């Protein structure tokens, strides 16, 4: 193989004590634009400054390579363990394979800033990819993130596979794969989490969000479309999927082979009404909100792992069009809260659909904001739609 750059040749120690970020960055700089591969051998690499990957760059890590965020450095907005280099004008053809990528959160070090709205605050995310065409992430062991493990926006063409999440300590807003807006044409497959993780949304499709929150600095709102998700496994995550749309569309999403134990939601489509930074306030969106369409969910098994008073495992408080679930199963043998509704649809006037269980079809029609439909227990298929015409 040509143009392989071993970071040891650029001066890394890999002993976990010295700051290896300058040496690794020299290797990344040498690879940029030359279809170069930066090889990171087994070792422990303390990273004191953000690593930046530029155009036409591949990073390949030995399975024994661990890179972690240095706890000794003061953090500021724009700091990460790894980011693409140019989030404004964009990058192309970036690939990262293998290794452990550690946010080094233990409750004492690398803590989330106290002021959620500090415009200069560190986001707390571990990996950052914004404005990238052709991104590949494969075989990454993501560990101990302060907030989002991997945050992304403005992606055009991506493959994310064989990603695992684990943390010694749970943290607030500890999303797994967090997508902001303007994301399209992607494949996500074989995503796993150890019990307890992720401690927020395992996969978040947030076409809309509050951009003044520190977690979302320099992300954006916008359409999320044409994505296939295959093979998502968690024994006890906070929430499996969030689909957050208020004004921007989420469409043409295919999800297959989902196996989730959830403390809160399997699929949350509440429009962020109940967050600390709600996007919909009382008196707004009286005709319904959101734009989620052409969603296919095939072979989903879910169960509740904690009694917490949540409204349902699948919560739809958003306008939906052609949202279809087939091969659904609620694992009642493992479910600790069987009385919790499986499906709840509300705050979506002019919504209609069907739920089929053992050949019996239940139809629903919501005429006003006050109307609600709930289904308890398991079901085989569900078809959810909106009567609105502005999709």
Q: What is each model feature region?
A:
Residues 1-391:
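Extracellular/periplasmic carbohydrate-active domains that bind, remodel
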């Amino acid at each position: 193989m040509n143009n392989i750059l071993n970071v040891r040749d650029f001066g890394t120690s890999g002993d976990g004590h010295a700051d290896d970020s300058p040496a690794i960055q020299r290797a990344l700089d040498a690879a940029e634009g030359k279809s170069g591969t930066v090889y990171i051998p087994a070792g422990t690499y303390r990273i004191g400054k953000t690593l930046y990957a530029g155009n036409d760059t591949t990073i390949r890590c030995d399975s024994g390579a661990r890179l972690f965020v240095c706890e000794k450095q003061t953090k500021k907005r724009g700091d990460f363990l790894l980011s693409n280099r140019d989030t404004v004008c964009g990058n192309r053809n970036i690939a990262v394979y293998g290794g452990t990528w550690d946010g080094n959160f233990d409750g004492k070090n690398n803590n989330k800033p106290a002021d959620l709205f500090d415009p200069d605050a560190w986001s707390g995310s571990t990996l950052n990819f914004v404005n990238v065409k052709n991104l590949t992430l494969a075989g990454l062991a993501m560990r101990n993130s302060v907030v989002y493990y991997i945050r992304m926006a403005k992606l055009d063409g991506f493959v994310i596979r064989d990603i695992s999440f684990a943390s010694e300590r749970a943290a607030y807003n500890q999303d797994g794969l967090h997508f902001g807006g303007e994301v399209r044409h992607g494949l996500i497959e074989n995503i796993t989490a150890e019990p307890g993780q992720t401690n927020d949304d395992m996969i978040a499709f947030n076409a809309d969000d509050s951009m003044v929150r520190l977690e979302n600095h320099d992300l954006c709102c916008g359409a999320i479309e044409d994505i296939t998700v295959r093979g998502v496994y968690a024994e006890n995550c906070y929430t499996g999927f969030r689909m957050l749309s208020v004004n921007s569309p989420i469409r043409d999403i295919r999800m297959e082979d989902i196996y989730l134990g959830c403390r809160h939601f399997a699929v949350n489509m509440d429009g962020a009404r109940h967050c600390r930074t709600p996007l919909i306030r009382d008196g707004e969106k009286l005709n319904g909100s959101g734009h989620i369409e052409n969603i296919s969910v095939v072979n989903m098994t879910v169960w509740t792992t904690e009694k917490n008073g949540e409204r349902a495992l699948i919560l739809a408080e958003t306008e939906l069009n052609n949202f279809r679930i087939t091969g659904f199963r609620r694992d009642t043998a493992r479910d600790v809260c069987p009385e919790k509704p499986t499906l709840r649809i509300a705050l979506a006037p002019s919504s209609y659909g069907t739920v089929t269980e053992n050949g019996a079809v239940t139809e629903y029609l919501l005429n006003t904001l006050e109307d609600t439909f709930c289904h308890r227990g398991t079901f085989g298929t569900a078809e959810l739609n909106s009567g609105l015409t502005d999709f």
